[in-house]
Amino acid sequence: MLKKTQWLALLMGLFFLPGVASAADIDGASLSLAWGVPFAGVLLSIAVMPLVVPNVWHHHFGKITTGWALAFLLPFAFYFGIHAAWVNFIHALLAEYMPFVILLTALYVVAGGIYIRGSLRGTPVLNTAILAIGAVLASFMGTTGASMLLIRPIIRANAQRSSMTHVVVFFIFIVSNAGGSLTPLGDPPLFLGFLKGVPFTWTFQHIWPDTLFLVVVLLGLFFVWDTWAYRREPAQPAKVEAAEHERLGFDGKFNFVLLAAVVALVLMSGIWQSPVVFDIAGTEVGLPGLLRDLGLVVVAVISLATTSHRVHTANQFGWDPMFEVAKLFAGIFLTTIHVIAML
């Protein structure tokens, strides 16, 4: 039986062996649609199971995602060979998954270090303004970062209202989805395109009219709905003492500087063309991308070190959402290997 050190040496040898890369070529045109079933299964599980069997999903989503990943990886290894499976696994890990998770973590940490304080009243005008601001911010700090920054202020502003479900639903539509369409920072598929060589400003140059149209229509629908709902609210007694009013402001302002650093690091990795490339099991890792990822880790550490505990407590900052996202996207990135090859 191999000792642990021998297994480690074997694993490291495979990890840094570029020669197996030739086994990783996949002819996407010859693949059947059956190879896309695990990918569809992951997406359907994420969409349906939290609604149908929420307790099962909450406690076992990691196992379910792992099951779909293995449903792809094991047949892949059997059909194309272990070397091909290994090389594609390393490529998905180093070229796509790790950069994505590191960027998302940095944006999540930086956004979690900014707290918007102040007394807000959830009128249709204010709610619409918050959603519009969130739509803009989502393309620069990610849909996750913008959502984390603004969801609590808008919930606080509407806390006295008897019905605010539509506010959260439109928040998800506008801030958590449509708003992140203009830069690679906004949405995972756009960031993957950026990693593949798509220019940083391509989406802004080509789809800003479509994004503007979609966001304006959604904001208009929301304003009409929210105005109707607001007028049906029972009258609230105006017994708020002057001392209870708090001026609008920000805690953790240094994180805005760190947010600018995140944008600069991503831009740097796309602009700087370095000849220095590290070959890891057939996956080329360029120096700009490596420095970007290391820089993002440093930014996240600085944010955690400089942000007061009071701000994190006020934001109810925790790691569970990031752990969940990391597990889910691990399955997504693995099961998309064949789907991307077919495309």
Named regions from a protein language model:
Residues 1-23:
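N-terminal secretory/membrane targeting signals
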Residues 6, 58-70, 94, 98, ...:
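Cytoplasmic-side transmembrane-helix entry/capping segments in multi-pass membrane proteins
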Residues 20-23, 54-55, 73-96, 105-123, ...:
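Transmembrane alpha-helix boundary signature
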Residues 24-35, 56-65, 86-99, 200-210, ...:
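Interfacial loop-to-helix junctions that mark the boundaries of transmembrane helices
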Residues 42-53, 110, 145, 149, ...:
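Juxtamembrane interface elements at the cytosolic ends of transmembrane helices
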Residues 56, 163, 182-183, 192, ...:
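Juxtamembrane and boundary regions of transmembrane helices in multi-pass small-molecule transporters
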Residues 125-179:
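Hydrophobic transmembrane alpha-helices that form the pore/transport pathway of multi-pass ion
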Residues 259-343:
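Transmembrane helical segments that form the transport core of multi-pass membrane transport proteins
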